[in-house]
């Protein structure tokens, strides 16, 4: 989760988020190099006294500054396209979770199991435990197994919502009358926080998401206890 004065991305908890961070660093490096080069050229042009009175055209330099940006754009576009296709792949999920956005809470259904569904509301500040996180903790967490492929189906009951967990690199719009899906793989245990990322009304900022990643054995015990 984001911490106080944190300006960077959250620590990744899935292979997809790791790839997103790598792409961010790759694109940022290229942008910094371009900025430094342009700044250096502008500085040198402003503070030198050299003048070429016979310069009419420069076909070579025009070719260079046309072809070079095209090559740079390819270096950014190709990794981006690869990542877009990776984000859309569904790889034989072990668990399917359905999330339904409401004004202003989430409801969840474990589609592979009978009778496991619940609503998840934000805990009000006056009811929060001393170690709770304001505007982020919920009364019912989503329990998911680590090291397992998870598919999530997202829809909405009223207006457009967006189910987002930054540490997992997941952001899926919930649209009324439509099922959107994506997949993710949690590679470590822990609590991962997210929020609705589509303005959906007065209490838009009060519908957080909390995922608790647990070992598979613990997940099976939790499923068994809820089924019984």
Swiss-Prot record:
Gene name as annotated: mt:CoII
Record field: catalytic activity: 4 Fe(II)-[cytochrome c] + O2 + 8 H(+)(in) = 4 Fe(III)-[cytochrome c] + 2 H2O + 4 H(+)(out)
Single GO BP term: ATP synthesis coupled electron transport
PROSITE patterns per the UniProt record, alphabetical: COX2 (PS00078), COX2_CUA (PS50857), COX2_TM (PS50999)
Required cofactor names: Cu cation
GO MF term list: copper ion binding; cytochrome-c oxidase activity
Protein name from the UniProt record: Cytochrome c oxidase subunit 2
Coiled-coil regions, chain positions: none
Name of one Pfam family that matches: COX2_TM
Protein task: Component of the cytochrome c oxidase, the last enzyme in the mitochondrial electron transport chain which drives oxidative phosphorylation. The respiratory chain contains 3 multisubunit complexes succinate dehydrogenase (complex II, CII), ubiquinol-cytochrome c oxidoreductase (cytochrome b-c1 complex, complex III, CIII) and cytochrome c oxidase (complex IV, CIV), that cooperate to transfer electrons derived from NADH and succinate to molecular oxygen, creating an electrochemical gradient over the inner membrane that drives transmembrane transport and the ATP synthase.
Keyword presence, RNA-binding: no
Source organism (scientific name): Drosophila yakuba
CDD domains: CcO_II_C
Quaternary structure note: Component of the cytochrome c oxidase (complex IV, CIV), a multisubunit enzyme composed of a catalytic core of 3 subunits and several supernumerary subunits. The complex exists as a monomer or a dimer and forms supercomplexes (SCs) in the inner mitochondrial membrane with ubiquinol-cytochrome c oxidoreductase (cytochrome b-c1 complex, complex III, CIII).
InterPro entries per UniProt: CcO_II, CcO_II-like_C, CcO_II_C, Copper_CuA, Cupredoxin, Cyt_c_oxidase_su2, Cyt_c_oxidase_su2_TM_dom, Cyt_c_oxidase_su2_TM_sf
Cellular component aspect of the GO annotation: mitochondrial inner membrane; respiratory chain complex IV
Location in or out of the cell: Mitochondrion inner membrane
Membrane-topology descriptor: Multi-pass membrane protein
Metal-binding in keyword set: yes
Positions bound to Mg(2+): 198
Chief place of localization: mitochondrion
Keywords associated with the record: Copper, Electron transport, Magnesium, Membrane, Metal-binding, Mitochondrion, Mitochondrion inner membrane, Respiratory chain, Translocase, Transmembrane, Transmembrane helix, Transport
């Amino acid at each position: 989760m984001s911490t106080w004065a944190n300006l960077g991305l959250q620590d990744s908890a899935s292979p997809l988020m790791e790839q997103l961070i790598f792409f961010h660093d790759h694109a940022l490096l290229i942008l910094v190099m371009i900025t430094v080069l342009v700044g250096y050229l502008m500085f040198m042009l402003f503070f030198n006294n050299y003048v070429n009175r016979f310069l009419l055209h420069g076909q070579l330099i025009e070719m260079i500054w046309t072809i070079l940006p095209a090559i740079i754009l390819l270096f950014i576009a190709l990794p981006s396209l690869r990542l877009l296709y990776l984000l859309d792949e569904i790889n034989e999920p072990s668990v399917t979770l359905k999330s339904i956005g409401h004004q202003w809470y989430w409801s969840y259904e474990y589609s592979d199991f009978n009778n496991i569904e619940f609503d998840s509301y934000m805990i009000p500040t006056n009811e929060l435990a001393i170690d709770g996180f304001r505007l982020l903790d919920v009364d019912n967490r989503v329990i998911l197994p680590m090291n397992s492929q998870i598919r999530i189906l997202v829809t909405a009951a009223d207006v457009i919502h967006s189910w987002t967990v930054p540490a997992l690199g997941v952001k899926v719009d919930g649209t009324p009358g439509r099922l959107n899906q994506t997949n993710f793989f949690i590679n470590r245990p822990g609590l991962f926080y997210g929020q609705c990322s589509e303005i959906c009304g007065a209490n838009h900022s009060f519908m957080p998401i909390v995922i608790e990643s647990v070992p598979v054995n613990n997940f099976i015990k939790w499923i068994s206890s809820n089924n019984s």
